Design a protein with these regions (language model features):
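Divalent cation-coordinating acidic motifs and surrounding scaffolds
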Residues: 1-185
């Protein structure tokens, strides 16, 4: 898709690009040096995440239209339910998601990237997502994506608590369709 920027069919380049499946910052640095993208003067916001495959999310933005003022990576901390429960080691986040205190049962996945800034003169908040995959079966991994959705909702709620009229864009690879319950919440 990025290679089609600047073609007659797609003469307008995006101002903001949420990227998933990013190996490291060097990949992004190489990408923005491509001739068609170099003309856009793109900035990069990227953090290494704890994902077991070593992939991250990032935001590319045209510097002439968007000025970031703050950014942070927000970890999605989820655990498998395979270790036997012990009352002292388990906390219930809600009725379906159980959080264990031990790291040996943690599912290491991508963080959610929160970027705030000004799109021209309007303050905007962008959340770049790459929710856990369906690898291992849709049903078996559904709770992981639901936890990602709940984290995303908490980020949005916290921004709206500060400013009820906040402009928020959440984007990325949700590994679910628009009708799945994780997306609709």
């Amino acid at each position: 898709v990025l290679s089609e920027i600047g073609t007659p069919e797609n003469s307008n380049a995006p101002t903001l690009i949420g990227a998933a499946e990013i190996e490291n910052r060097d990949v992004l640095e190489d990408l923005i040096k491509e001739p068609k993208l170099q003309l856009l003067d793109l900035g990069i916001i990227h953090f290494d995440s704890p994902d077991k495959r070593g992939i991250d999310v990032a935001l590319l933005y045209q510097k002439k239209y968007f000025r970031p003022t703050s950014y942070s990576n927000i970890p999605l901390i989820i655990y498998k339910k395979e270790i036997p429960k012990k009352e002292k080691e388990t906390e219930v986040l809600d009725e379906d998601i159980e959080v264990k205190k031990e790291d040996n049962n943690r599912v290491f996945t991508r963080d959610q990237l929160l970027v705030s800034g000004f799109l021209e003169d309007e303050e905007i908040h962008i959340i770049v997502n790459h929710w856990p995959s369906r690898s291992g079966g849709e049903k078996a991994t559904s709770l992981f994506r639901e936890a990602a959705g709940k984290l995303n909702r908490r980020i949005i709620d916290s921004l709206q608590q500060i400013n009820p009229k906040a402009k928020i864009l959440t984007m990325g690879d949700f590994n679910d369709g628009p009708l799945n319950k994780k997306i609709g919440r």
